[in-house]
Amino acid sequence: MAIEMQQIIELILAIFLPPLAIFIHGNDCNMHVAVNIILCFFFFVPAVIHALWYCFFRA
Protein backbone atom coordinates (compact mmCIF):
# COMPACT_ATOMS: atom_id res chain seq x y z
CA MET A 1 0.00 0.00 0.00
CA ALA A 2 1.68 3.16 -1.18
CA ILE A 3 1.13 6.48 0.48
CA GLU A 4 0.33 9.11 -2.10
CA MET A 5 1.55 12.69 -1.98
CA GLN A 6 -2.06 13.90 -1.62
CA GLN A 7 -2.42 11.88 1.60
CA ILE A 8 0.82 13.28 3.03
CA ILE A 9 -0.29 16.85 2.28
CA GLU A 10 -3.71 16.20 3.82
CA LEU A 11 -2.10 14.73 6.94
CA ILE A 12 0.14 17.76 7.43
CA LEU A 13 -2.74 20.16 6.80
CA ALA A 14 -5.06 18.20 9.11
CA ILE A 15 -2.61 18.76 11.95
CA PHE A 16 -1.83 22.44 11.32
CA LEU A 17 -4.82 23.80 9.31
CA PRO A 18 -7.73 21.37 9.72
CA PRO A 19 -10.37 23.34 7.72
CA LEU A 20 -8.03 23.59 4.74
CA ALA A 21 -7.42 19.84 4.80
CA ILE A 22 -11.17 19.20 4.68
CA PHE A 23 -11.62 21.76 1.91
CA ILE A 24 -8.90 20.16 -0.22
CA HIS A 25 -10.14 16.62 0.42
CA GLY A 26 -13.76 17.43 -0.40
CA ASN A 27 -12.97 19.80 -3.28
CA ASP A 28 -15.68 22.20 -2.10
CA CYS A 29 -16.79 24.29 0.85
CA ASN A 30 -19.34 22.03 2.51
CA MET A 31 -20.90 21.66 5.96
CA HIS A 32 -17.84 19.81 7.29
CA VAL A 33 -15.61 22.81 6.53
CA ALA A 34 -17.98 25.12 8.45
CA VAL A 35 -18.15 22.73 11.41
CA ASN A 36 -14.38 22.45 11.46
CA ILE A 37 -13.90 26.23 11.38
CA ILE A 38 -16.19 26.53 14.41
CA LEU A 39 -14.27 23.74 16.16
CA CYS A 40 -10.99 25.54 15.43
CA PHE A 41 -12.21 28.72 17.07
CA PHE A 42 -13.25 26.98 20.27
CA PHE A 43 -11.42 23.64 20.51
CA PHE A 44 -8.38 22.99 18.33
CA VAL A 45 -7.79 19.32 19.19
CA PRO A 46 -11.33 18.21 18.25
CA ALA A 47 -10.91 20.12 14.97
CA VAL A 48 -7.78 18.09 14.22
CA ILE A 49 -9.58 14.84 15.10
CA HIS A 50 -12.52 15.82 12.88
CA ALA A 51 -10.19 16.62 9.97
CA LEU A 52 -8.34 13.31 10.35
CA TRP A 53 -11.64 11.45 10.46
CA TYR A 54 -12.98 13.25 7.40
CA CYS A 55 -9.83 12.80 5.32
CA PHE A 56 -8.85 9.25 6.23
CA PHE A 57 -11.59 7.27 8.02
CA ARG A 58 -14.85 8.47 6.47
CA ALA A 59 -16.21 5.94 4.00
From Swiss-Prot:
Cellular component GO terms, alphabetical: membrane
Keywords: Membrane, Transmembrane, Transmembrane helix
Membrane topology term: Multi-pass membrane protein
Entry's transmembrane regions: 5-25, 37-57
Subcellular location: Membrane
Pfam families given in the database record: Pmp3 (PF01679)
Keyword ATP-binding: no
Family note: Belongs to the UPF0057 (PMP3) family.
Predominant place of localization: membrane
Protein name: UPF0057 membrane protein F47B7.1
PROSITE patterns: UPF0057
